């Protein structure tokens, strides 16, 4: 069965509740790191997990009750998630560990897992019903830091959906919490990986010493694409055939040293740039999220669940990007990623404090986050691993439409690959799909028609 975006169903929700830690936890104030309270992380990010009811030992268990108890027990260890965010002098964010709890919704849907189709991928039908935006709950300050909805399906399967205040954790961090919930739900006494706060590691130096030219945070005048009310959401699957087609267009000296993600990113950057039709003389940016945990000496602790990534930017003009071979974009991306070191992370923290915690550049910017190894699909609440686990949609963020994710997926033929949800204005989406199709089929792209002739 194919992915059915036209699927419609009813969801019956119970009244939202707050789940508090199962035991009393300390009331204290914990500062976020100076990397975390930047403007570009002050938004809510949605995650969704689909679970098949095929475990006979769990036949009589209610996933809502099992997960509710798992959350309460996990919050004893991850108690800052049960608190509320406050802002103090200098726009500094601090968690007040109040123990108020995370928001939880119990729900039932009159649909089966099979009706979603064999290829579960964003955008998901009726998503706003599977992760309900409780009025008044979505603020960055003074609001629940997590909202979780568990929806039973009429076939016995269920959906776990979560909304995270991104200032609190990155993909690796929220997966640690979700795995802890799963372990506690399955009866563990403690999480296998104990959480570590240690946000001071990523604090600014005194005085701040910005040692890199952080082009990802440059102030650029201009506008990003509009209108926001005409954004289209689509997903594209990349298996071995598609990746091989891209690699054939790369110079031999880059084929062996470039990762699949880097090759894919170079291709998508060009296609998306053609789609948004900037002036060829305008700068365009490709921001790649780089997990910096291993860049430190010693590496950050395994249980560190805060944001620990950099967003280096590859920068060139639209004309150069689209008129040069794919290897040109690839080398820019690889060079930007190589910049990320421990010193680079300290420099980012220093920049945040010195310049008022700015948003990253969004004009003519595309940002991709690779969650293929984050472990969303491995989260097990007792019913086995998720049949889909990961970000719920592309285009999330303070500025809609800038961000995409690389998500692991097995397609209808059973082939493992990567799915990319992307968000663009409807007209731009058609151009993107055409450019991508031409690239994968080795067809020449008519660059000139995507730019104004007078500017070429």
UniProtKB/Swiss-Prot annotation:
Q: What switches its activity on or off, per the activity regulation note?
A: Inhibited by magnesium, calcium, cobalt, zinc and copper.
Cross-referenced PANTHER family, in alphabetical order?
ACYL TRANSFERASE 4, OS05G0315700 PROTEIN
Subunit arrangement?
Monomer.
Source organism, top-level taxon: Eukaryota
- The answer to whether the entry has keyword Transferase is yes
EC primary class = transferase
Provide the pH dependence: Optimum pH is 7.7.
Catalytic machinery residues: 166, 380
Q: Does the keyword Acyltransferase apply?
A: yes
Q: Which family does the UniProt entry place this protein in?
A: Belongs to the plant acyltransferase family.
Q: Which of UniProt's keywords are assigned here?
A: Acyltransferase, Transferase
Which Gene3D superfamilies does the entry link to? Chloramphenicol acetyltransferase-like domain (3.30.559.10)
Which catalysed reactions does the entry list for this protein?
benzyl alcohol + benzoyl-CoA = benzyl benzoate + CoA
Kindly summarize what the UniProt induction comment says about this protein's expression: Up-regulated by wounding. Expression peaks 6 hours after wonding, decreasing afterward.
Look up the EC number in the record and give it. Answer: 2.3.1.196
For this protein, what is any one GO molecular function term? acyltransferase activity
Q: What is this protein called?
A: Benzyl alcohol O-benzoyltransferase
Tissue spec: Highly expressed in stigma. Detected in stamens, sepals, petals and style. Bearly expressed in leaves.
Task: Name the species this protein comes from.
Answer: Clarkia breweri
Question: According to its UniProt entry, what is the function of this protein?
Answer: Probably involved in the formation of benzylbenzoate, a minor constituent of the floral aroma.
């Amino acid at each position: 069965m194919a992915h059915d975006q036209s699927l419609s169903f009813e969801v019956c929700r119970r009244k939202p509740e707050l789940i508090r830690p199962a035991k009393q936890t300390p009331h204290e104030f914990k500062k976020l790191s100076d990397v975390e309270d930047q403007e570009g992380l002050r938004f809510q990010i949605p995650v969704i997990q689909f679970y098949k009811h095929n475990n006979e030992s769990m036949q009589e268990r209610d996933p809502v009750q099992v997960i509710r108890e798992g959350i309460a027990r996990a919050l004893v260890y991850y108690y800052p998630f049960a608190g509320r965010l406050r802002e103090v002098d200098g726009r500094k964010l601090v968690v007040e560990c109040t123990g108020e709890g995370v928001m939880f919704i119990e729900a039932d849907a009159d649909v089966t897992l099979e009706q979603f189709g064999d290829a579960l991928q964003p955008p998901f039908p009726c998503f706003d019903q599977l992760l309900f935006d409780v009025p008044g709950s979505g603020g960055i300050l003074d609001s629940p830091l997590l909202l979780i909805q568990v929806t039973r399906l009429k076939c016995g399967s269920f959906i776990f959906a979560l909304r995270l205040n991104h200032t609190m954790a990155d993909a690796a961090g929220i997966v640690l919490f979700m795995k802890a919930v799963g372990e506690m739900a399955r009866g563990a006494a403690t999480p296998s990986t104990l959480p570590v706060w240690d946000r001071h590691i990523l604090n600014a130096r005194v005085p701040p010493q910005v040692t890199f030219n952080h082009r990802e945070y440059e102030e650029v005048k201009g506008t990003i694409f509009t209108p926001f009310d005409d954004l289209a959401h689509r997903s594209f699957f990349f298996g071995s055939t598609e990746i091989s087609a891209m690699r054939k267009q790369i110079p031999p000296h880059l084929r062996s040293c470039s990762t699949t993600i880097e090759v894919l990113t170079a291709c998508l950057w060009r296609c998306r740039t053609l789609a948004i039709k900037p002036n060829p003389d305008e700068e365009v940016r490709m921001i790649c999220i780089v997990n910096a945990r291993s860049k430190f000496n010693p590496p950050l602790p395994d249980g560190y669940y805060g944001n620990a990534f950099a967003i280096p930017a590859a920068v060139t003009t639209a004309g150069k990007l689209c008129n040069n071979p794919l290897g040109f974009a690839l080398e820019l991306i690889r060079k930007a990623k190589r910049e990320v070191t421990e010193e680079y992370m300290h420099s980012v923290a220093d920049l945040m404090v010195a310049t008022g915690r700015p948003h990253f550049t969004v004009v003519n910017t595309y940002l991709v986050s690779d969650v293929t190894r984050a472990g969303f699909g491995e989260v097990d609440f007792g019913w086995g691993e998720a049949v889909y686990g990961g970000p719920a949609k592309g285009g999330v963020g303070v500025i809609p439409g800038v961000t995409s994710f690389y998500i692991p997926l097995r397609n209808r033929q059973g082939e493992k690959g990567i799915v990319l949800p992307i968000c663009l204005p409807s007209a731009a989406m058609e151009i993107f799909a055409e450019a991508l199709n031409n690239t994968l089929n080795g067809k020449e792209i008519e660059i000139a028609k995507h730019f104004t002739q007078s500017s070429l």
